[in-house]
Regions:
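Transmembrane alpha-helices
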Residues: 380-416, 437-449, 453, 457, ...
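Short helix-to-coil transition segments within interhelical loops
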Residues: 29, 366-369, 373-393, 419-421, ...
Length: 852
């Protein structure tokens, strides 16, 4: 449709300009936002294509350039602007490069199925309960080989049960008849051969493992082959023999069904998980409440000083929140050591920032009337908070606290991935040991714990928000007793959690110097560097004297007190004309290039660039037979050889940040593609009230709730086994996590649509599919897009940490740097994560505002 914004310019001019500089034609036509967006999009995509060397994608990029020029032409002609074709071309290039960067290879999902199959099977075979087993064992010795005279065996035979052999000695490869008596009647068992060292192996006959089943009298007869149990190199000397043994074993159920050791350990770790979450939440509230008042604009807007405090506090809270809890766990583990204490500190630190932000926003949204009324009485700031603010915010604060406790429980299940606390620690260990059934037990426990606590916290939040009392009884005595029980239970739980978390404040104090030094290194990111070259000056040293003549003389700026000598002779090394106040290295250098420092932590030049080192001749420089060139004494130092440039750390961080962003993008897209069709099947108003509809609805809703309980970090462990460690594993884990999350959000939106348009379309005789397309979908596009952007925002945060367990991205490199004590490089990664999260958070918030 023609537009009234027609320009007097020739439409070919802006089209030509946009062909030369993409977006410039739109800018001169006063479509500045559109022009800048196209400019940035084109060159960002061009950079991705060149970086990935995916030159085939230059074709759609060229088509995009032509479209940009055509768009400028149409705008100049007065046509309405559109984005359809451009978004398609941008998507082709963007997702093409993203699939390359994230190493998405669908074929690996097929070839890796044998690796992941044990995980899937184990979910149906968890180690929950077992029956105690009684072991019935019969053993009898036998000599191999036979000798004359035959010595007595050096081990005793059992008498009940008893094994009787067809011969007291035998040879390797012979058949041996074994009769058993006194065994458990009508029970099966297995035969074993015990070598002289006591190591058992399965007995065989005709290539099959020998088993037996005792008759009603507890007797059996079997034949087995005498194995080569002793290596040929360890055979006894002629005339000597070794004592072997034949062993029969029955494992018989004995006693009642009882929890397995795995389940008992999981239950113990469940308590630890809840304790960490509870303690972190309680301590977080204690610190977050006062901080939240300092972060509330309506309470701090009185003067420039309070506004400065407000801005500083807000900035600090945003930085802390931008860094995922697992990153904090690594940092605190360096500070106070591995263990529950480090995990609790990480949860607490992040909880303070998260709750303080939520609390401050609640404070900013309160009614200002009571505040003004209290201020008018001349009340102080603390009085205003107590009498005008607290009564309004207490219900909201309580609701936010329960919500955060729910989050902390989920985080506590994975905090063990970087420490030895919580259920996550068990999951990691069992995955590494290929104990899949034990891992399944832990996963089931995580799902149940999260689901139960999620239900309880949701129930409490609902009652608090609705203003309904938690204790519904009106009997004063009952209410008093229940309140007392709650208070005593809270205190007891706090003490128990404190002990479980192994809180040792003295360790925090002892580690403070190291922690502060660590903080300084993290706060000094490695942003820039200058190329250097190594400068070396040297002088020959012949040991012993007269052994050889050096072919290269000494440099003019280095002198030795002696040109030759013997091992241990004193030697003074002097250097002149060196850079002043510079650390240099002084070393013995061998003709083959090997070297040894003269002294550790050596040495620094003085203000005039002079150096003097007193030492003794080291044995390493003694000339060997056939050696024609003596060793040398060398002074080396680094000299700047170029301009300031971005450090290699920054280059690595930028590259991995792009990988992280694209991982989040691909995972969000895959999750949305699968979640959209499933969400319609999980919406009650779409599925109807038929038996089949209800079955599908409840089945999918249950799947969503169960799958959402498993944290992406645990899914990464499985995905890394499936397709191999790397970005693809991270994408796969995030996508699997996104499907239930987005599916639930989408289905809730579908259930909340306006029924009016649906009824209107249905009344025309439209089918269910037509009603869906023309009455339902138009209402769902804005909220669906908003949820997808919201999930992408979450995925960006998660992408920064899933690399800890094989998911690729910047998190994997961060952990490597920390493990190598390269905290400056790790600080650079932290800075990049904060910038990335802040930027994407801002952009996604703006996008959601426009959509909603």
């Amino acid at each position: 449709m023609p537009s009234e914004n027609k320009t007097s310019l020739s439409p070919w001019l802006p089209a030509f300009l946009s062909l030369i500089i993409p977006g410039s034609g739109q800018i001169i036509l006063s479509h500045k936002t559109r022009g800048f967006a196209l400019f940035l999009a084109f060159f960002a995509l061009l950079g991705l294509v060149l970086w990935t060397q995916a030159y085939a994608l230059l074709a759609p990029l060229a088509l995009l350039l032509i479209w940009i020029a055509r768009d400028a032409y149409r705008l100049a002609k007065g046509s309405e602007p559109s984005w359809g074709v451009s978004l398609l071309l941008i998507g082709i290039v963007l997702y093409g490069t993203a699939l390359i960067v994230t190493e998405v290879r669908p074929t690996r999902m097929i070839t890796g199925l044998p690796n992941v199959t044990p995980y899937l099977r184990s979910l149906f075979n968890p180690e929950l309960f077992e029956t105690p087993m009684k072991e019935v064992v019969g053993v009898t010795p036998i000599m191999v080989p036979c000798v004359d005279p035959l010595p007595a065996p050096n081990r005793e035979a059992t008498t009940s049960p008893q094994l009787i052999l067809s011969a007291p000695c035998t040879e390797v490869g012979d058949l041996l008849q074994v009769t058993g008596a006194g065994f458990e009647p009508n029970e099966s068992g297995q035969m074993q051969w015990i070598d002289p060292l006591g190591s058992p192996r399965r007995a065989t006959f005709d290539g099959e493992v020998v088993t037996f089943k005792a008759d009603e009298n507890g007797r059996f007869d079997v034949t087995l082959l005498v194995p080569q149990a002793v290596p040929l190199t360890a055979q006894p000397a002629p005339g000597e023999t070794l004592t072997h043994a034949v062993r029969a074993v029955q494992n018989i159920p004995s006693g009642r069904l009882q929890p397995t050791q795995t389940l008992s350990l999981v239950i113990e770790k469940i308590g630890e998980t809840i304790a960490l979450a509870f303690l972190a939440t309680v301590m977080g509230v204690i610190f977050a409440v006062p901080v939240s008042f300092l972060a509330a604009r309506n309470l701090m807007s009185g003067n420039p000083v309070t506004m400065l405090i407000y801005n500083v506090v807000r900035a600090i809270l945003n930085v802390i929140r931008s860094i995922e809890t697992l990153l904090w766990a690594i940092i605190f583990a360096v500070w106070v050591g591995l263990g529950p204490f480090a995990g609790t500190l990480a949860l607490w630190f992040h909880t303070v920032a998260a709750l303080a932000k939520l609390y401050s926003e609640a404070i900013e949204s309160i009614d200002s009337g009571p505040i003004e009324a209290v201020k008018a009485t001349g009340a102080s700031w603390p009085q205003m908070v107590i009498y005008a603010v607290f009564p309004q915010i207490l219900p909201t604060f309580t609701s936010f606290t329960l919500y955060r406790f729910d989050i902390n429980v989920r985080l506590s299940t994975v905090i063990g991935l970087v420490s030895d606390a919580g259920l996550g620690f068990l999951v990691v260990q069992w995955v590494r040991l290929n104990r899949f059934s034990a891992m399944a037990t832990a996963l089931i426990a995580i799902i149940l714990v999260v689901a139960i606590l999620d239900f309880l916290s949701s129930w409490l939040r609902e009652r608090i928000i609705q203003g309904r009392p938690i204790i519904s009884s009106t009997n004063p005595l009952v209410r008093t007793v229940l309140k007392t029980v709650i208070i005593v239970g809270f205190v007891a739980t706090f003490i128990w959690s404190w002990n479980v978390a192994q809180i040792k404040l003295i360790e925090l104090v002892k580690g403070a110097p190291q922690g502060l030094a660590l903080a300084r290194e993290f706060a000094t990111p490695e942003l820039f560097t200058r190329p250097t070259k190594t400068v070396a000056i040297s002088a020959p040293l012949t040991v012993p004297c007269g052994a050889a003549e050096p072919s290269t003389p000494a440099d003019a700026t280095i002198t030795l007190s002696a040109d030759c000598g013997e091992t241990g002779d004193p030697l003074v090394i002097e250097g002149t004309g060196l850079p002043p106040n510079r650390t240099v290295s002084v070393r013995w250098v061998l003709p083959d290039g090997g070297y040894l420092r003269v002294r550790s932590n050596c040495c620094d030049t003085d203000d005039d660039g002079n150096l003097r080192v007193e030492t003794a001749i080291n044995p390493i420089v003694v000339m060997e037979e056939g050696q024609t060139e003596p060793a040398r004494v060398e002074i080396t130092y680094e000299e700047i050889a170029g301009r300031i440039q971005l450090s290699e750390t920054v280059r690595t961080v930028i590259r991995l940040s792009i990988v992280t962003l694209l991982m989040a993008l691909v995972a969000t897209t895959l999750g949305a593609l699968f979640a959209i069709p499933l969400s319609f099947l999980a919406a009650r108003n779409i599925m109807g009230d038929t038996p089949a509809g209800r079955t599908i609805y409840y089945g999918l809703r249950t799947f969503f709730n169960v799958a959402r309980s498993i944290e992406p970090l645990i899914l990464v462990l499985i995905a890394a086994t499936w397709v191999g460690a790397g970005p693809f594993a991270g994408v796969l884990a995030l996508a699997l996590n996104n499907i239930p999350n987005l599916g639930k959000l989408f289905s809730d939106s579908i259930e909340e649509i306006n029924s009016g348009p649906v009824e209107a379309v249905t009344s025309t005789g439209a089918t269910r599919m037509q009603s869906l397309v023309y009455a339902v979908v138009p209402q769902l596009v804005p909220p669906f897009l908003a949820f997808i952007i919201y999930q992408w925002d979450i995925n960006i945060r998660m992408s920064t940490v899933i690399g800890f367990v094989g998911g690729g991205g910047i998190g994997q490199q961060f952990r490597i740097w920390v493990s190598l004590n390269q905290y400056g490089a790790a600080g650079t990664a932290i800075l990049a994560i904060v910038i990335m999260v802040w930027t994407m958070d801002y952009l996604s918030a703006k996008a959601r505002e426009r959509l909603i």
